[in-house]
């Protein structure tokens, strides 16, 4: 019977804390892109939220929950793919030592779509997807849009 009060105190302390520790951000620029695109393909919005952000860190740590869910839902719809191929990158971005840019060929049913994706180095040293350039991704579910260097 003595164990019950101790157990209740421990449970109370564990429940009183904020959210658990966040998964560490990828330590390489390539891993950030690969993990993000895998999360897009798997429709894993939670994982996408932890791999997309700014130099401050993952959006899941600082963005309001409803806004974040809406944004990653839109990103997932626009970047949904059956496979991908890195066309070029990581490329340095002029005057931005913290950014690297890729051109990614998203493989979709019936076509491929080239999309630029920027990855940023966080203040803590990891890498996150920063800008997915949705304007280049074409309409979700629609025909692929012509883009330079892309075969239709």
Placement of each model-derived feature along the sequence:
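Sec-dependent bacterial lipoprotein signal peptides
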Residues: 1-13
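Short, low-complexity N-terminal intrinsically disordered segments enriched in polar/charged residues
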Residues: 15-42, 50
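Short solvent-exposed beta->alpha transition segments
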Residues: 30-31, 45-101, 107
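Intrinsic-disorder-associated interaction segments
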Residues: 22, 26, 61-68, 125-127
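Positively charged, low-complexity intrinsically disordered regions
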Residues: 3-4, 18, 122, 152
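Functionally engaged cysteine thiol sites
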Residues: 15, 53, 58-59, 137, ...
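Exposed beta-sheet edge and beta->alpha loop/turn motif
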Residues: 85-152
């Amino acid at each position: 019977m003595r164990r019950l009060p101790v157990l209740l105190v421990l449970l109370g302390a564990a429940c009183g804390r904020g959210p658990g520790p966040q998964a560490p951000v990828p330590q390489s620029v390539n891993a950030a892109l690969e993990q993000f695109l895998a999360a897009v393909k798997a429709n894993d919005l939670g994982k996408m939220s932890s791999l997309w952000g700014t130099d401050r860190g993952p959006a899941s740590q600082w963005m309001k929950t409803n806004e974040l869910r809406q944004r990653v839902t839109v990103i997932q719809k626009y970047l949904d793919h059956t496979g991908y191929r890195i066309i070029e990158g990581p490329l340095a971005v002029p005057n931005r030592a913290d950014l690297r840019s890729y051109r990614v060929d998203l493989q979709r049913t019936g076509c491929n779509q080239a999309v630029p994706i920027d990855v940023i180095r966080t203040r803590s040293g990891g890498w996150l997807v920063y800008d997915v350039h949705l304007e280049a991704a074409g309409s979700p579910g629609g025909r692929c849009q012509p883009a330079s260097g892309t075969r239709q």
